[in-house]
Amino acid sequence: MDKVQQQADLFGKTISPFVASQPTNVGGFTDQKIIGGSETTQPPATSPPSPPSPDTQTSPPPATAAQPPPNQPPNTTPPPTPPSSPPPSITPPPSPPQPQPPPQSTPTGDSPVVIPFPKPQLPPPSLFPPPSLVNQLPDPRPNDNNILEPINNPISLPSPPSTPFSPPSQENSGSQGSPPLSSLLPPMLPLNPNSPGNPLQPLDSPLGGESNRVPSSSSSPSPPSLSGSNNHSGGSNRHNANSNGDGGTSQQSNESNYTEKTVIGIGIAGVLVILFIAGVFFVRRKQKKGSSSPRSNQYLPPANVSVNTEGFIHYRQKPGNGNSSAQNSSPDTNSLGNPKHGRGTPDSAVIGTSKIHFTYEELSQITEGFCKSFVVGEGGFGCVYKGILFEGKPVAIKQLKSVSAEGYREFKAEVEIISRVHHRHLVSLVGYCISEQHRFLIYEFVPNNTLDYHLHGKNLPVLEWSRRVRIAIGAAKGLAYLHEDCHPKIIHRDIKSSNILLDDEFEAQVADFGLARLNDTAQSHISTRVMGTFGYLAPEYASSGKLTDRSDVFSFGVVLLELITGRKPVDTSQPLGEESLVEWARPRLIEAIEKGDISEVVDPRLENDYVESEVYKMIETAASCVRHSALKRPRMVQVVRALDTRDDLSDLTNGVKVGQSRVYDSGQYSNEIRIFRRASEDSSDLGTNTGYYPSQDYATSHEYESESRAFNTSHRNH
């Protein structure tokens, strides 16, 4: 027991300058009391036991009440200490030596010595001494000469077991000597104040009991022995630290490279997505621009075909596109085998043709400089040339005569209408040309001239009755398509025999939409410019300019009268009062129906080579079409049904019996013609042929006016 006491005294003399501090002074090191070791001094009763030796578990030394408790070293966050446990005196936390020289005085005997310690300049107060004092700390382990050596390699020990220590036995003390100081001290790790990311955490310390215990890492090295292997262990620790540092740097570099590659990949993907969206946007915009014509309430295509008559092509409008025309969903060819025309460029958004745009040079080349020898007719607002395209297809080129605003509107109207209308009995538009002041429309060339040519041409064979019936039915179907199946309806406004073209099979095709107008309401349209041809004008249109679809019905009735009688609409070679076909035919039609004698109204050139029932049917149809009252006239659908079927013709009468319809008064008709002439006096379209081919004017305005005046005088005398 005495030997143990001596070792304790020696231990107290050795480390007392580093562990004694006032308990209340936590901010830093202050004056320390060092108790000199005497053989009679006992450790305090409340001091915890010293750590066990490597071989056997040690017990805390016996307690004594004579020694006062030492002060605790400074701590940034002082652990909670139970009030019943005063601080121990033997095993304080590791305290590396100050950079200053050793204490100025040493303890002698039992008298305490006060040694001032300067406060360390640490950012936060720590439980451990400044790192600069670690290398100067004297090694408390005794060597053979009992000389303290500095600790070269600070080591860290695992936390001691939580079980209470028992005092060391005499056998262990006698056999092994005094316990090593390294086993009694907590680990002293080098502290780097410049690395806040790696704070030094103390292991379990006997000063704080359970409250001061910090869980030790599983990778902590095992306690080194007191032999010379400490240096090797320290070098190994440094090597491991360097290896860990290199691994951390490599891992950070890999993470940085991965992050950089990820950012680059995301950027490239974003750019590709943006380019894809932009491409889709521009493609759709281009398609919309190329396939959609400007919205106009006046030029809209039909939604579908509803008339169940032979020769119609049934189209269906695409849903959701109010501007799409009937041709958008039409078959590749029409009923005549003509190719379906596609949409064009933005310059030709109103055109729907396969060859949408022609240059002026191209048209000049195929017409040899628009030579007069290529002229095949003169239309309502220009000449018509025949040309051969480069692929050998013949076309009819209609030139706009005037560059006025009215002529341009007519040109645009015809382009927009014809490009959207495709029917077996309607002329197809091939293309157009706009070059400075020149405007051209290119139509499919119909080779067999016009109905006017075959009916009234000189030195020509007589047109057979069967062909006349076929022509009447075909023209009626084409006109019915314009009225019934285009929305809004299209009013041709210049139906006449010279605007009905014939192909090689004598199938009729209605042409010349230069004077066409659209009627977008059920109400009549008042035109500011009366246009048409003498002999075909409806009375209400000639007198007031009121335009309806029944105006076209009246004009078509005049065409039927031409087919029946073979006479011209206005023939100045006829006797006075009989120059107008309508005035001459109406009383004779009524008489033929009542008496059953049609010999006076049928074309004598046929020489009775006709079907009488068909003649009667056409006579009744023509009589209903030329009624004075527009409301009493049938619609074109009824006309088609009357001509093309064997059904009863009662629907043509509209409640009017034969002979009860108001008959034209010759004087009244002449007055209406004079009003019409004054309204359109400046129009160059009147009295001209609007088809492809030339035909003679039926009457000059001078002759017609003088004859009408003479006829009115004789009529009043009667």
Curated annotation (Swiss-Prot):
CDD domains linked: STKc_IRAK (cd14066)
Keyword Cell membrane: yes
Modified residues (Phosphotyrosine): Y443, Y541
Any coiled-coil regions, as ranges: none
Chief site of localization: membrane
GO cellular component, one term: plasma membrane
Pfam families recorded: PK_Tyr_Ser-Thr (PF07714)
Entry's transmembrane regions: 263-283
Domain annotation Protein kinase: ranges: 370-649
Sugar-bearing residue positions: N231, N254, N257
Residue intervals annotated with topology Extracellular: 1-262
Gene3D superfamilies in the record: Phosphorylase Kinase, domain 1, Transferase(Phosphotransferase) domain 1
Similarity comment text for this entry: Belongs to the protein kinase superfamily. Ser/Thr protein kinase family.
Name this polypeptide is given: Putative proline-rich receptor-like protein kinase PERK11
Species assigned in the record: Arabidopsis thaliana
